[in-house]
Swiss-Prot record:
Domain C-type lectin: 137-234
Full protein name: Accessory gland protein Acp29AB
Chief localisation class: secreted
Cited function: Responsible for physiological and behavioral changes in mated female flies.
Disulfide bond positions: 139-228, 207-220
A single MF term (Gene Ontology): carbohydrate binding
Organism from which the protein derives: Drosophila simulans
Length: 234
């Protein structure tokens, strides 16, 4: 009797354990939780693409603006360089004409246009004012040359025959010799100079004139009177 009751209780105990344990086991047909959607959805990708397209377009416009500004600056620099080269080439053209014989020298100098100073003859232009380049050509057309003054005595003799004015002479630094003033006739430094002290030295002051028994430098395109020498050598 007791054995039967004990077996019955054990059976009930096992049945309770089985029924209680199954309550904790999830149903195999239960719905699983939905996975979290990724952040980069199709809409977000499209928005990012639009952002980058806009960014790239702005950067491209900025780059094009920079290129346009650079091209404009380069064009201005080229024009300035061309103008500067034209100025620098003008004296070289004159020298080339001189050496090529386009301005032909002749011994038949019209001496009536020249005055004797010491042992040499000079034409002192008292009325016409020209640039240094024009004065150079005018003296060559007389079959002479812009004056190379040999000494102070010759300088004083020339100015004694001339009104109180400024006169171009053959001293310049148009062709680079280390920034040194030279004669275009000899290609060497002048044998005589008498500079006015404390002159304002400027890069474009490349041509020399005489005034009041002293020598000055000025821009070659300034118009002044000039002195030619009859002989075509130094």
């Amino acid at each position: 009797m007791y054995a039967t009751n004990l077996l019955y209780l054990l059976a009930l105990w096992n049945l309770w354990l089985v029924s209680g344990g199954q309550q904790d086991i999830p149903n195999g047909n239960a719905t699983l939780p939905s996975p979290q959607k990724p952040q980069n959805t199709i809409d977000q990708i499209g928005a990012n693409q639009n952002y980058w397209f806009t960014y790239n377009a702005l950067r491209q416009n900025e780059t094009l603006a920079i290129i346009d500004a650079m091209e404009s600056g380069i064009a201005s620099s080229v024009l300035a360089f061309q103008a500067q080269m034209e100025i620098q080439l003008q004296p070289l053209k004159i020298i080339m004409l001189h050496h090529a014989g386009n301005i032909k020298a002749s011994n038949n100098i019209k001496m009536s246009r020249f005055e004797k100073v010491g042992s040499r003859y000079f034409h002192i232009e008292k009325n016409l004012t020209l640039t240094w380049f024009e004065a150079y050509v005018t003296c060559r057309e007389m079959n002479g040359h812009l004056a190379n003054i040999r000494d102070e005595k010759e300088l004083d003799g020339i100015l004694a025959l001339a009104p109180n004015n400024s006169y171009w002479v053959d001293i310049s630094k148009l062709v680079e010799y280390g920034g040194t003033f030279v004669s275009t006739l000899t290609g060497r430094e002048p044998i005589f100079v008498k500079w006015k002290p404390n002159q304002d030295k400027k890069k474009q002051h490349n041509c020399v004139y005489i005034y009041a028994k002293e020598m000055y430098y000025d821009e070659c395109f300034e118009k002044k009177s000039f002195v030619c020498q009859a002989n075509q050598w130094a």
